[in-house]
Amino acid sequence: MAYPESSQPAASGPALPESQPTTPVSDEAVERQAARRTRRAFLVGGVAALAGIVGWNWLLDAPQEDGLAGPLRRVLDANGRLATAYFRNTRLATEFPKSHAKPLRKNGTEGLKSALGAVAWRLQVQGYAPAGTTPRMQEFTLDEVKALPRVEMTTEFKCIEGWSTIVTWAGTRLSDFLAKYPLATSSGRPVDPNNPPTDLAPYVSLVTPDKEYYVGLEIESALHPQTLLCYEMNGAPLTPEHGAPLRLVTPLKYGIKHIKRIGTIAFLDQRPPDYWAVRGYDWHAGH
Ligand SMILES: Nc1nc2c(c(=O)[nH]1)N[C@H]1C(S)=C(S)[C@@H](COP(=O)(O)O)O[C@H]1N2
Ligand SMILES: [Mo]
């Protein structure tokens, strides 16, 4: 199949994603918009400066800790702990207006070839266990996953073959799932940067029910706020080809990591095998 937006044949190995052509806009329209933006920036900037002066005086009046105003010190400490613990090299993927979403092509059928009994399907989760102990196993129905907070996001899905599509996804954050069901820690406590670092599993493995497709993630990616256990695409329930009943969506990574039809999730102390990494692609597959 030839895809017009890709200059690389699909079989030629990893291709860099290309920027997609956007709707052409006249110079005049661009200038009008720029002028509006500048006016708004002045206004927003002025309000921010005022808030800054008021806030700054409040901060300077507060008692000092470590040569820094107390409230500032505490915020920096808390954020610093979280950031250094989990989001050292992280950013957020750009989100788009929902109206930009387009149908996503079907790509990749490993692990989807056998019939899936919708009634029999359960998400199996293997908890993180200290070495030499038997891990906890817990089963979840789709309804239990759907009972968690629903998050919707419109992000760009990028396949390593060189094409991309903006898609609206809905599901639950893997981090929210783990807040309710604390299976990523050996203590069974929710993820918390104040816990000893060894309490948290460094890796996650996701495998289809038939074990034909499998993905490995670092825990930082699994806990990222845009990493979803996803059950809806472009406003409709996921179809089997797109990974029903549950797939992974993690928009800072290429499509190869967005495993469709998740059967088992396991929290591990070793980097798990990954379908495309064992075939020569980068294990992290970030972009
Ligand atoms: N189970 C499973 N998940 C998979 C694949 C696969 O072959 N099997 N292919 C991956 C690749 S390479 C891509 S680009 C996306 C495509 O998702 P889509 O079919 O919903 O577009 O699924 C990913 N997840
Ligand atoms: Mo892909």
Which ranges hold each PLM region?
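Active-site-proximal beta-strand/loop segments in catalytic clefts of secreted hydrolases
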Residues: 128, 160, 207-209, 232, ...
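Active-site scaffold segments
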Residues: 175, 228-232, 237-270
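Near-N-terminal "mature-domain entry" segment
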Residues: 30-184, 188-192, 257-273, 277-287
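...with weaker cross-activation on analogous glycine-rich loops/strands in unrelated enzymes
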Residues: 209-240
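Extracellular/periplasmic catalytic domains that process cell-envelope and extracellular macromolecules
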Residues: 116-118, 150-152, 197-199, 221-223, ...
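Acidic, glycine-rich loop-and-strand cores that form catalytic or ligand-binding grooves
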Residues: 182-212, 219
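N-terminal secretory signal peptides
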Residues: 1-37, 48-50
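Solvent-exposed loop/turn segments at secondary-structure junctions
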Residues: 164-165, 211-213, 236, 254-256
